């Protein structure tokens, strides 16, 4: 993006740059969130009353940055919240967001929340350097009756706490009443709003209901009020949404919230896979980003089950980078597919080292490859030498990817884990037979025994006639299945959505 494009998008409210003036004096590297830029990923972390502490949360921060999280939210509800926040802000290179109400009620009941407590807490966190606040000001008194028919009610911590406050006092949401004063604090320190969705659906059964949409309409009004104060704002979204409702939800938000960047949690597209919700939500996140979301809040395997640990943070970041990257490719974001194409060229050239270097997680890719065949041959353990389609294709014709110097397979390339016996493979390429190569590459001696011809697996390259090839594929008494390849009758000729 050019400087002029960034200025125009920020001025229109379609792009935000969460960068607190006080955080800029530390290690912050500012970034932008909006439809004009690539899709961003947020990682949540924070100590709970029963688990973790400051050191562990700082370690999670570093781990999230390692796995390309674009922002991090500190959602601590236990321990020394102030010290934990200070430590995270001092170490982070990415924008940090918080939910100030968590600090407001430490040591007191939600019913005791007052205007003074709200403004003092927001001011203190802004002075510390927090880059964006999640404020659940869109939950109003008139929305509370709408959740009575829900299966799971209110699943947002901030939303449920403020609903309890309103019922106790018989008054409108105090965050809504204090909105303009909070805006002044944000303007002073350049804190961005992430307007919280306190009535987001917590299950597919509650998706797109009156409570969710009613709050979203109020959020659109709050966004306009923030803009009038010169404060940047993005909007948080659901949650749990069936696949067929995601596009509608994204487009509705853009209309009701005047194009402000949408920041969604998932959404999960099914509720019955606890332990795998980083996958169920990444599916929804990909669709959400394609249809309008600007930032995706990751979900880890621990979602609904417990506090994420270090490896859970990695799993969530990787799943959501896949979702964001996939959407950017589909949207045609310039340069988003470059690495994919380069990796395909390396794969076509059978250049393993470049293949690993271009991958998102080179160490994991190399480990999986070396598990069965820790030598860089012109095939892998999945197919072996004779069944390698890429190798066979290269025998038929030369691909463009194999002609460039950077993708050419260097036969001297080898894994750092090679032993002397395996190193002979690379020294004698073109001399040894495939059987001898397999024997040398075997992790254990005797794994491939070429002397015992009776145990040798039949290979298609050993046969040339059709009758003999069919015998290999058939067990006694069986017949080959002929596939029907005519056009299916129920495929749509035109997709009205597209």
Task: Give the predicted meaning of each segment.
Residues 1-29, 405-423, 427-455, 459, ...:
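An N-cap/entry alpha-helix motif that binds or orients negatively charged groups
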Residues 1-30, 108, 320-362:
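Surface-exposed amphipathic alpha-helical tracts and adjacent flexible/coil segments at the periphery
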Residues 1-270, 276, 282-295:
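Alpha/beta enzyme core
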Residues 20, 299, 389-393:
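Short hydrophobic alpha-helical segments that form membrane-spanning helices or hydrophobic packing faces
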Residues 29-35, 146-147, 154, 161-162, ...:
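A mid-to-C-terminal "edge-of-domain" accessory segment
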């Amino acid at each position: 993006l050019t400087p002029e494009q960034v200025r125009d998008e920020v001025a229109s409210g379609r792009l935000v740059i969460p960068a607190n003036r006080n955080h800029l004096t530390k290690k912050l590297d500012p970034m932008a969130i909006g439809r004009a830029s690539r899709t961003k990923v947020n990682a949540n972390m924070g100590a709970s009353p029963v688990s973790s502490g400051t050191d562990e949360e700082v370690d999670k921060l570093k781990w999230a940055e390692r796995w390309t999280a674009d922002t991090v939210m500190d959602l601590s509800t236990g321990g020394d919240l102030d010290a934990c926040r200070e430590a995270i802000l001092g170490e982070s290179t990415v924008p940090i967001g918080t939910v100030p109400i968590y600090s407001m009620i430490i040591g007191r009941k939600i019913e005791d929340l007052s205007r003074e407590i709200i403004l003092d807490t927001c001011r203190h966190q802004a002075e510390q350097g927090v880059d964006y606040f999640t404020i659940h000001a869109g939950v109003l008194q008139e929305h509370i009756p709408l959740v009575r028919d829900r299966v799971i009610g209110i699943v947002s911590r901030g939303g449920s706490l403020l609903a309890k406050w309103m019922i106790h006092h018989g008054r409108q949401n105090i965050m809504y009443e204090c909105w303009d004063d909070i805006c002044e604090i944000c303007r002073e320190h350049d804190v961005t709003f992430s307007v919280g969705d306190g009535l987001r659906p917590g299950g597919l059964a509650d998706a797109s209901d009156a409570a969710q949409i009613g709050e979203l309409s109020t959020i659109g009004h709050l966004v306009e009020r923030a803009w009038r104060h010169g404060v940047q704002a993005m909007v948080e979204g659901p949650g749990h949404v069936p696949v067929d409702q995601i596009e509608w939800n994204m487009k509705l938000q853009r209309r009701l919230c005047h194009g402000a960047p949408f920041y969604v949690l998932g959404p999960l597209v099914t509720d019955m896979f606890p332990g795998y919700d980083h996958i169920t939500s990444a599916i929804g996140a990909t669709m959400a980003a394609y249809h309008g979301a600007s930032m995706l809040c990751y979900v880890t395997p621990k979602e609904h089950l417990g506090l994420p640990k270090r490896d859970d943070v990695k799993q969530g970041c990787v799943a959501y980078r896949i979702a964001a990257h996939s959407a950017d490719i589909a949207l045609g974001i310039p340069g988003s597919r470059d690495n994919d194409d380069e990796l395909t060229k390396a794969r076509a050239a059978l250049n393993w080292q470049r293949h690993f270097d271009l991958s998102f997680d080179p160490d994991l890719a190399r480990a999986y490859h070396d598990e069965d065949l820790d030598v860089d041959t012109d095939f892998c353990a999945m197919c072996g030498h004779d069944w390698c389609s890429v190798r066979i294709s290269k025998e038929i014709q030369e691909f463009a990817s194999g002609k460039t110097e950077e993708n050419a397979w260097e036969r001297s390339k080898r894994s750092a884990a090679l032993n002397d016996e395996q190193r002979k493979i690379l020294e004698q390429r073109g001399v040894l037979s495939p059987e001898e190569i397999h024997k040398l590459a075997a992790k254990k001696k005797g794994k491939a025994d070429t002397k015992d011809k009776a145990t040798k697996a039949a290979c298609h390259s050993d046969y040339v006639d059709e009758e003999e090839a069919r015998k290999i594929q058939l067990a006694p008494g069986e017949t080959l299945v002929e596939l029907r390849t005519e056009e299916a009758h129920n495929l749509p000729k035109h997709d009205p959505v597209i």
